[in-house]
Amino acid sequence: MAASAAATAAASAATAASAASGSPGSGEGSAGGEKRPAASSAAAASAAASSPAGGGGEAQELLEHCGVCRERLRPERDPRLLPCLHSACSACLGPATPAAANNSGDGGSAGDGAMVDCPVCKQQCYSKDIVENYFMRDSGSKASSDSQDANQCCTSCEDNAPATSYCVECSEPLCETCVEAHQRVKYTKDHTVRSTGPAKTRDGERTVYCNVHKHEPLVLFCESCDTLTCRDCQLNAHKDHQYQFLEDAVRNQRKLLASLVKRLGDKHATLQKNTKEVRSSIRQVSDVQKRVQVDVKMAILQIMKELNKRGRVLVNDAQKVTEGQQERLERQHWTMTKIQKHQEHILRFASWALESDNNTALLLSKKLIYFQLHRALKMIVDPVEPHGEMKFQWDLNAWTKSAEAFGKIVAERPGTNSTGPGPMAPPRAPGPLSKQGSGSSQPMEVQEGYGFGSDDPYSSAEPHVSGMKRSRSGEGEVSGLLRKVPRVSLERLDLDLTSDSQPPVFKVFPGSTTEDYNLIVIERGAAAAAAGQAGTVPPGAPGAPPLPGMAIVKEEETEAAIGAPPAAPEGPETKPVLMPLTEGPGAEGPRLASPSGSTSSGLEVVAPEVTSAPVSGPGILDDSATICRVCQKPGDLVMCNQCEFCFHLDCHLPALQDVPGEEWSCSLCHVLPDLKEEDGSLSLDGADSTGVVAKLSPANQRKCERVLLALFCHEPCRPLHQLATDSTFSMEQPGGTLDLTLIRARLQEKLSPPYSSPQEFAQDVGRMFKQFNKLTEDKADVQSIIGLQRFFETRMNDAFGDTKFSAVLVEPPPLNLPSAGLSSQELSGPGDGP
């Protein structure tokens, strides 16, 4: 199409220039003489249009058909060529807009100053610039040309003899006599004389004669006037003008037009390339918009997940506090009701005795009546203790400001340096956010920056985030990249978030590339930190105590990273009842956090370099994804396809030797095989028919591992992971303290003897509950032990069917609550004496 358009443009431009610059003396002859180069250029344009590079049938239709009526241009339709190189019938051009009073005799058009709109491209042009389309005029004039050439006479002599030959060099028709003379003259004897057609010079092109000298052909090209002339006109009207022979002029003009066509073709190819690049950029911009939408939805999903998790923690904490108060009040109410009934009976009997007329009976029963009356008066009834008010505290203004500052979209121009997100101004002015390392610029890089205040009303300062510290980073690099991306949907969250709910405190840092996930740091509280440019929060900074007489549900003072490797906590954290304190580098082991204790922690986070991104193999997540469900540490993790729990290879039960596939399911989600099909004749106690104690069968081994993995993943069981490493437990029972880690080692046959039956496994777990129960006097802890025991028994029953393990579990002692000052002897009767 480019070659066709270029050839057509060049040929039409040459035709228009020649017609416009014709002299008055050779007006019609000049117009007719232009048919020779014009026809040649039209043939070249037609060939280019029909080639594979051409525009096809539509481009050819625009060249040979009217742009208005779509009819083929014929001489009888008076075809016209506009300056924009579009063709149209003279009748289809329509009336011109008058712009001047001058009229032109060219085809009866409007005045020279009138404006005409092109029917194809709507470009305006002057009517004087519209010329006749000589290419299409010659298409139907072959017959008339042949009849005219048949009567052509010789022009070399005065005899008017019919011409039988034609000299190509002289462009003259010759008779037989002149041909012989032509071949005798030394100057003309080498000329080419054709006898095939007296008036034919080329196939498809007829000879054009001068309109002044009717018998003289147009064989010269006047360079000064830029028009075709005959020999007589060149000697008279164009005397002393520079001229060329027709063949030389055509050759030179073709070279000039070919050079222009080549230049325009190169420019057109560059334009096509740029057009493709712009179209590709449009698609890239659309892809960037979709990717930004996905990033925003992913950030919102992560925030809602953290809100859901935090909401469950707060609800559980409130439930624990209220359950203890409710149980104590119920026991007090039961005691008071019993005393009340006893006093009512004494009052009723004493009143009945006083109203009785039997004086003898009154005197005989005086001792018993006095005894019960004095005994009832001695009973001490404790007053009702006022219970403190419990309320949920949160800063609405801070959360509103945090929501208003939720992220930002930064579009970087190509060539600019990426310096990372600047410090965001949070509601409570935390320390500045700094991102270490330098990153390469992207054509369109989306960066999200967040700054928020703390949700702890008693906190005096904000934690300072200086980056991310990786753990388990030396476990090797795995090629490839496969990440488990959660579905962006609100139906998966079981927390009802109303319109008044606010997002948690969080900060977002961009990934190293546009394909990496952004680092979202969730803050569920704040610890005391040095203001300004302080490095990290010092561990162990005390928080402000709660108000007296008010039960406050404590919030966790921790930070969680989503989409990037979370840092290992550097100090203990405040957790609910039976939640462990995260061990730091110098800690001896996990400890139980007292409900009344108040601690705070600092977290140092070191950001990874932007220029490098960790990669992982199929089925494995690097430490930037999440933390292990068992050990709560980052690293190379595998994610379950169903529950989306993440585990280290050695933390999962059974331990994984290789990285599983993408559709891997953990032991908690895997369907257990039927006990009867797997075990055969082997009983639950692990002994065979000969009475020799054997190891656990493969089916029982898998079921025990599933139950133990459920205990490891159960949040309230976290203090029981490593009881034996704590000095407190070692002093109570030296050498005999059990914890989940030792039970796992024995189940994996790392300690001897291994378990031989599920009952033995259940006995060890029950003994662990009993040991922990002896070490605590807190009623809430005892209540939690009862809940853990029920959880374990439920898991065992689910794994082993109808088999009951209640007998092997140690039942913790009942709660010894006060009986309002009454002993069992006093409530039983007066048999003890006064």
From Swiss-Prot:
Q: Which gene name belongs to this protein? A: Trim28
Modified residues annotated as Phosphothreonine in this record: T498
Region annotated Leucine zipper alpha helical coiled-coil region, chain positions: 247-377
The UniProt entry, under Gene3D superfamilies, shows: Bromodomain-like, Classic Zinc Finger, Zinc/RING finger domain, C3HC4 (zinc finger)
Query: Per the record, which residues fall in region Interaction with MAGEC2?
Result: 248-377
Residues annotated with Phosphoserine modification: 23, 26, 30, 51, 139, 418, 438, 440, 454, 471, 473, 479, 489, 501, 594, 683, 689, 697, 752, 757, 784, 824
* Start and end residues of each Bromo domain: 695-799
Modified residue Citrulline is at which positions? Answer: R470, R472
Q: Which GO terms describe its molecular function?
A: chromo shadow domain binding; DNA binding; Krueppel-associated box domain binding; promoter-specific chromatin binding; protein kinase activity; SUMO ligase activity; transcription coactivator activity; transcription corepressor activity
Functional note? Nuclear corepressor for KRAB domain-containing zinc finger proteins (KRAB-ZFPs). Mediates gene silencing by recruiting CHD3, a subunit of the nucleosome remodeling and deacetylation (NuRD) complex, and SETDB1 (which specifically methylates histone H3 at 'Lys-9' (H3K9me)) to the promoter regions of KRAB target genes. Enhances transcriptional repression by coordinating the increase in H3K9me, the decrease in histone H3 'Lys-9 and 'Lys-14' acetylation (H3K9ac and H3K14ac, respectively) and the disposition of HP1 proteins to silence gene expression.
What are the residue ranges of zinc fingers typed PHD-type? 625-672
Question: Where are the residues of the annotated region HP1 box?
Answer: 476-513
**Protein localization:** Nucleus
Keyword match Iron: no
- Origin organism of this chain? Mus musculus
Residue(s) carrying Phosphotyrosine: Y755
Could you tell me what this protein is called? Transcription intermediary factor 1-beta
Q: Where is this cross-link: Glycyl lysine isopeptide (Lys-Gly) (interchain with G-Cter in SUMO1)?
A: K378, K469, K750, K779
Task: Give me the reactions it catalyses.
Answer: S-ubiquitinyl-[E2 ubiquitin-conjugating enzyme]-L-cysteine + [acceptor protein]-L-lysine = [E2 ubiquitin-conjugating enzyme]-L-cysteine + N(6)-ubiquitinyl-[acceptor protein]-L-lysine
Q: How does it assemble?
A: Oligomer; the RBCC domain homotrimerizes and interacts with one molecule of KRAB to form the KRAB-KAP1 corepressor complex. Interacts with SETX. Binding to a KRAB domain is an absolute requirement for silencing gene expression. Interacts with a number of KRAB-ZFP proteins including ZNF10, ZFP53, ZFP68, ZNF382 and ZNF256. Interacts with NCOR1, NR3C1 and CHD3. Interacts with CEBPB (via the RING-type and PHD-type zinc fingers). Interacts with CBX5 (via the PxVxL motif); the interaction occurs in interphase nuclei and competes for binding POGZ.
Q: Which GO terms describe its biological process?
A: convergent extension involved in axis elongation; DNA methylation-dependent constitutive heterochromatin formation; DNA repair; embryo implantation; embryonic placenta morphogenesis; epigenetic programming of gene expression; epithelial to mesenchymal transition; genomic imprinting
Question: What does the record note as the disruption phenotype of the gene behind this chain?
Answer: Embryonic lethal with arrest at stage E5.5. Gastrulation fails and expression of the critical mesoderm differentiation factor T/brachyury is lost.
Gene Ontology, cellular component aspect: chromatin; euchromatin; heterochromatin; nucleoplasm; nucleus; RNA polymerase II transcription regulator complex
What does the PTM comment state? ATM-induced phosphorylation on Ser-824 represses sumoylation leading to the de-repression of expression of a subset of genes involved in cell cycle control and apoptosis in response to genotoxic stress. Dephosphorylation by the phosphatases, PPP1CA and PP1CB forms, allows sumoylation and expression of TRIM28 target genes.
